[in-house]
Amino acid sequence: MELPILPTSIIGSYPKPRWLLRMYNLRELGRLPEEDFREAVRDASVAVLREHERAGIDIPWDGEMGRSEMTEYFTAKIAGFKFYGPIRVWGNAYFNKAAAVSKLEYREPLVLDEFRWVKENTTREIIKVPITGPYTIAEWSFNEYYSSKEELAFDLAKILNKEFKLLEKEGATFIQIDEPAMLNHPDEVSIAVEAINRAVKGVKVKFGLHVCYSNYYLLADYFDDIKVSQFALEAANRNFRDLDYLKKLTHQELGFGVVDVHNPRVESPEEVAKAIRKVMEYIEPERLYINPDCGLKLLDRRIAYQKLVNMVKGVEIVRRELAREGKTSIPFRREV
């Protein structure tokens, strides 16, 4: 499979339509049948896919329309987790933090139905499936059963490995593991690395790893130890400063974040193009994918869409420059 040079993608989440948020509220109040809720999620999924395609995104996803939160969605489907109620994260934001109260077991598919639906309803040949990684789920859960976080993370890796194999069997070609908590504790990074490697073992798809708002110099020390083909990292939020850690990314691909998901200001195409030219001082364009810094769900939907539109326009500016050098496409590589 071939892709245009500098393929564009999203990281995962996208703002939910207001009417879907109302469906979530009605469901929580017990006033919406589950069948109606699922239909609403699927309708929103198709609407978001069309937005991404209209913006020009090469590798889309449905913006996680069926996911209320990036860990709760998964822990609710894994046997051995229990919920005591919502906890406060910041401000007025809450989430249901799960507790591991018995040995974790694979009970049901985690994202298989999502993948099937997106695959059936996109016009794109390649889609990327985002899944929260084993260490982040362990870090963001209470541990009331296992002797250590390491043991908990490794059992989660086994469960994810089963899911990854199911996705491969269904035709998935690109899976992104989201590990925002991976670098929270520098003395535990090796645990996260081993958990990721156990999760991907024996699965022959392209794996990416997304880590955001962290010490990338610490991550860079492990670039060659993590068995993934691509690292999707944010850079716009830090104003593209201090990219020297990329010197250690010698052969893997980089998913480069060029729009800030925490700032409602819409970047211009020229700003995006300038950022891409800067990162090409470190990474050749054949190893570059372009994406937002992180998930877009906290933004107004209109702003999120315009950020994607301008991101693609900025990419097209650089593509025209690269075309003059005869660089127009790259192969879709599952392993690098």
Curated annotation (Swiss-Prot):
Cofactor: binding details: Binds 1 zinc ion per subunit.
Family annotation (SUPFAM superfamilies): UROD/MetE-like (SSF51726)
E.C. number(s) listed in UniProt: 2.1.1.-
Cofactors that this protein relies on: Zn(2+)
Pathway(s) it belongs to: Amino-acid biosynthesis; L-methionine biosynthesis via de novo pathway
GO molecular function: 5-methyltetrahydropteroyltriglutamate-homocysteine S-methyltransferase activity; zinc ion binding
Origin superkingdom: Archaea
Protein name: Methionine synthase
Naturally occurring in which organism (per UniProt): Thermococcus kodakarensis (strain ATCC BAA-918 / JCM 12380 / KOD1)
